[in-house]
């Protein structure tokens, strides 16, 4: 696998496709460029999903996220593009991408985009776990 930015998302087979389970990822180093000014934008991405048959492979996700660093993107557009690409790659039962952009012009922007597979219903009383934000060091 390459160590260069790439739009290719790789997957692997869900090890337990008969069970709904929640995958939570925090991606603290997302960058892209403001399409108006060319200035860098920074965000923390939170990816939550319930896989069906496929899970996203982490290194390919890292390289995919890295591929946006030199692209001009509006916050709303890039959040939805990333979600759409992940949905195409993994076809999850449920996926939510939350993008928390750092302040620009005195305004913090948060964008939340969701996908539900047609016909999928969560089990009764299932709530996705809340995770505290993690630093790069786990204790």
UniProtKB/Swiss-Prot annotation:
It catalyses: 7-aminomethyl-7-carbaguanine + 2 NADP(+) = 7-cyano-7-deazaguanine + 2 NADPH + 3 H(+). The active site is at 34 (thioimide intermediate), 41 (proton donor). Pfam families: QueF. SUPFAM superfamilies: Tetrahydrobiopterin biosynthesis enzymes-like. Keywords: Cytoplasm, NADP, Oxidoreductase, Queuosine biosynthesis. It comes from the Bacteria. InterPro entries: GTP-CH-I_C/QueF (IPR043133), NADPH_dep_7-cyano-7-deazaG_red (IPR050084), QueF (IPR029500), QueF_type1 (IPR016856). One of its GO terms (cellular component) is cytoplasm. GO terms for biological process: queuosine biosynthetic process; tRNA modification. Substrate binds at residues 56-58, 75-76. Pathway: tRNA modification; tRNA-queuosine biosynthesis. Its EC number is 1.7.1.13. It is found in: Cytoplasm. It is an enzyme of class 1 (oxidoreductase). Its main location: cytoplasm. One of its GO terms (molecular function) is preQ1 synthase activity. PANTHER family: NADPH-DEPENDENT 7-CYANO-7-DEAZAGUANINE REDUCTASE. HAMAP family: QueF_type1. NCBIfam families: QueF-II. Catalyzes the NADPH-dependent reduction of 7-cyano-7-deazaguanine (preQ0) to 7-aminomethyl-7-deazaguanine (preQ1). Belongs to the GTP cyclohydrolase I family. QueF type 1 subfamily. This is NADPH-dependent 7-cyano-7-deazaguanine reductase. It comes from Methylobacillus flagellatus (strain ATCC 51484 / DSM 6875 / VKM B-1610 / KT). The gene is queF.
